[in-house]
């Protein structure tokens, strides 16, 4: 039987592995749920890709640069996923409103709708730094 420090090392290692595998499994399961088709036959990620593809012609270089600025605080590992989610929401709004071109107002609205409330503090600070009026977005920010 195991005794002493080696027993504690093995127990610590087993607990650590279970915790790390649980955390990884949680995130993998969330991604799996987003890939599952809904009632309409498409998953959340399929719709996101659809909106990005169909609104691609509405984007210009300034909009892409502004999206890069908005996703700058996101860690590099998750930045592409964050950009895709935000761009998908902006594309959805653009297609539903049938706009001719995506403008900054639509991008801010899409960012607010696509991100959790905790990210809105960065948006407010960034918009103040760029001297953009927050008043039109107050109802969305609450």
From Swiss-Prot:
Subcellular location: Cell membrane
Gene: yneK
Species the sequence originates in: Bacillus subtilis (strain 168)
Chief location category: membrane
The keyword Metal-binding is assigned to this record: no
Recorded topology in the membrane: Single-pass membrane protein
Description of how the protein assembles with itself and partners: Interacts with the N-terminal D1 domain of dynamin-like protein DynA.
The organism's place on the tree of life at top rank: Bacteria
Name of this protein: Membrane protein YneK
Record bears the keyword GTP-binding: no
């Amino acid at each position: 039987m195991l005794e002493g420090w080696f027993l504690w090392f093995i127990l610590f290692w087993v607990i650590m592995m279970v915790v790390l595998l649980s955390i990884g499994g949680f995130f993998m399961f969330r991604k799996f749920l987003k890939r599952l088709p809904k009632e309409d036959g498409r998953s959340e990620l399929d719709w996101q890709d659809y909106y990005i593809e169909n609104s691609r012609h509405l984007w210009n270089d300034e909009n892409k640069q502004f999206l890069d600025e908005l996703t700058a605080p996101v860690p590099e590992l998750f930045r592409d996923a964050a950009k895709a989610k935000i761009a998908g929401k902006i594309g959805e709004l653009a297609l539903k409103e049938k706009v001719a071109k995506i403008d900054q107002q639509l991008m801010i609205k899409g960012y607010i709708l696509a991100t959790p409330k905790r990210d809105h503090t960065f948006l407010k600070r960034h918009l103040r730094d760029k001297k953009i009026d927050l008043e039109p977005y107050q109802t969305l920010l609450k």
